[in-house]
């Protein structure tokens, strides 16, 4: 609904219960336009209200759980009651004085242009129309072309022109005067064209205080960049309206409502402002120069003075920054063109103590180098909602997902960090500040030249886990542009050795004070490297230079589901469902089904006419919609029997449905039908007029409604006769059979009124746990011989056929002979029937043929599965002379494919009977043992590859490789191999490698490792089962989660209640596990096996548990001079205390 000039939102929009995204950009909606209605919509996820007329955030929005909310910068409100301000009036031509006639016409044209231009937002309109004082008196004609510097007298005016935002041709940078002497705190800002912009005051902030703009994030509100700025600290790097990061020299147009742009940019355009630090005496908010009039435009001499002052300020900032890093402030400027300087106001800075810098190493700075000011917040109590300058979420957007920090910078040191995916020369300078620790003291020692930090905390890996971090105390990044000409450094002197404290090498610009690893910056290539630190114990070398170059890069191969799957964007759930935000839960699905059934069960007055019932009631439309989906087991397309008295028209509607007509004609229906539709000799249904008043509960007459699913169970609950041998319950509004006798269960499975596919599935999967085949045959025979109509007999034969097809592996030879004897008795009974004998005999002959083909092995259940697309070509090429296969040379997705093929072959060998035996008796059948041994072998192989890597660099690369393999297995829905790989990384022998894990915790690989490790925790096994149940086949489940759950179900629930009732709730839970594994067995993967790789994955050398622990201990002894200290702020390499 964007760009529609909407002025109001109707309250009826809240009736859209499944609305997730609303786009209302560029409309005319205000706070009283009904926007607050969106606060009552719980399903809303995305809302765009940019370029509207909102003046404040509606209070109802705080309750929404939005993933995206786009708003304009809020229009600030005055805290105090402001006086009525006079509007600017057009000058009137007086007949007595016509000397200013030309000027008056020009001003009138300006007013017309100003009135014709529609404001982009209320904020711009406020900036245009607000005035703090009365309008100036009309000047004379002489004042228009005056060059006098006295611009605030009554003889001069400020020209009223069109807002520069609407001036698309304006390219020159604006000149803002930042006078330091005799400036009022509440002075207005005057742009280069003379437009007076009054100072903005917020609702909860006193006049003259610090001004902020606010931006809404996904979960909370965090303050954005400073709203009003006369410096260039936020012109070098700022946020646009979409939350991205742009440079000021970009050619793209800037949104006028961009959050984080300075107020000077909002008025004058996107060019960086040039600060004029003249010491002129200005008052009343005016700004200007002695050689300028109207606050802008000036002579060349004034502009040259401005450039000189800007260079002087830039030099001072360089010196300050140089002292912070522990170096001298001597710098040489090679160029002085286009150098914006940094204003020392209005940002307060923290106290920085700089004693002595290293003067032995001169540093050259290029004049073209742009330096941004390091901003520190002032101490004080700050509301956590408005505490940091930048939240971790905004930093994530600014860095454009390039958030990898290879090594944690030390506390208090401004360390250039190379960002992942950046090109040469793309560096940022990070300063870690804290909102809680107000004063930061950076001091230096004469001997060590090493800065130390007091009361300073930071978090190095916050970008990887920004969802779980708060805005308080989060680090803030500011860009420090690097000059095009690298400075020249003299040859470094020998490093200073000290046993107590590490020294700073003369060639190094930065040092980590908390570790022996010394970080250096190579200015010639503009890349960050790390020098090699040696220890005095055992001469062990920790090559941090190689470690710094190691980085985790995702390597997940896509397919038709998703062409470019990435864990960093989708996480584990997104890899399984790339096209869905989330899967509907079972509870939500059950509620939808219950609501649809409840609508169908609406009571209709028995005295109402048929025409009114079918034309006006929602029953007809609901029943017709569900009847079209009668082939789906999730929808039962018929109403309950107890809901209608007059059913003639409804019966006609049901009979007109193809699925219902098949049922009444003896055809195949859902859940197993017979071949009676081929003969068509079944007794026709009685006329509708004859069955209008017939009770549905009478089993001796032909029923006119066939119920399925939940409606069938719900109808049984209303029958007083059936309730004698059955107990019902309800789960989330869905009716369930709780306890039942075997005789009643047989009756329900062959009931003439309907069927429940769920009840049939429970029986076929778990009947061997509570009964036996001979006992079931006995009850079926009794049901067939005592049936009062041919429909019951037909249902018995249909159920027997389905039983043989699904559970043929359960039948032994004696069971087959018993079944044939039962069918022979049924044949004799059919011969005695007068009607329907031919149809029943045909169904019986079909069942006998199926049994004979099953015994001979000639029965074909279904055709061989075919795929629409060919299998992907294996991504593996073996060289002719290469005998051995190296793990690091293989692609992760191809290893995952071969692991999936191996696991699926072993999974298909497990039978249903073996699953039941394991759940009841914990019997280890050969098929289950093979799956278990394969899982344990994969765990040992991964652990062996990690431990046998000789250096820490190789161990890190090996872990990165296995993380990518696990992610590819997860994407292929091979949960078994993915869990095995992560279980190997959780072994105690692997977790002993503290140096290795200390580095990995600060890389992108840590996020998927931790998320996978959480799934294998005992408390999260239920969550893993829910994920496996929600995916579609093909998939390979982690059987450990299913088997442990089945054992707990069997041990914690009784099989027989009150000595005769079968506990159907227990077997319902058991049946769900069996069905999940069965579905995974039936669906195959469309992959190509590679014999060489499969042999490599099955015959590789592995170490035992004892050998793994021994090798890991040796690695720890070699690296005993270093330990890893893990805190909530990251991992830091420290020297072990003796």
From Swiss-Prot:
Q: Where is the composition biased (Pro residues)?
A: 487-496
| Region Disordered: start-end pairs | 126-180, 239-301, 319-360, 389-411, 473-540, 601-643, 660-680
The annotated regions of Low complexity compositional bias extend over 140-158, 326-352, 512-540, 605-634
User: Which keywords describe this protein according to UniProt?
Assistant: Guanine-nucleotide releasing factor, Leucine-rich repeat, Repeat
**Which residue range or ranges hold the N-terminal Ras-GEF domain?**
733-855
UniProt key word Repeat: yes
InterPro entries per the record?
A: Leu-rich_rpt (IPR001611), LRR_dom_sf (IPR032675), Ras-like_GEF (IPR008937), Ras-like_Gua-exchang_fac_N (IPR000651), Ras_GEF_dom_sf (IPR023578), RASGEF_cat_dom (IPR001895), RASGEF_cat_dom_sf (IPR036964)
* SUPFAM superfamilies linked: Outer arm dynein light chain 1 (SSF52075), Ras GEF (SSF48366)
Give the Gly residues compositional bias ranges.
Answer: 283-299
Q: Which CDD domains match?
A: REM (cd06224)
Q: Where is the composition biased (Polar residues)?
A: 263-275, 498-511
Q: Which SMART domains match?
A: RasGEF
Q: Where are the LRR repeats?
A: 1-16, 18-39, 43-64
Cellular component aspect of the GO annotation? plasma membrane
Q: Where is the composition biased (Basic and acidic residues)?
A: 393-405
Q: What's an example GO BP annotation here?
A: Ras protein signal transduction
Annotated Ras-GEF domain residues: 891-1118
GO MF term list: guanyl-nucleotide exchange factor activity
Role, per record:
Promotes the exchange of Ras-bound GDP by GTP. May play a role in chemotaxis.
Query: Which PANTHER family does the protein's record reference?
Result: GUANINE NUCLEOTIDE EXCHANGE FACTOR, RAS GUANINE NUCLEOTIDE EXCHANGE FACTOR N
Q: Please identify the protein, giving its name as recorded.
A: Ras guanine nucleotide exchange factor N
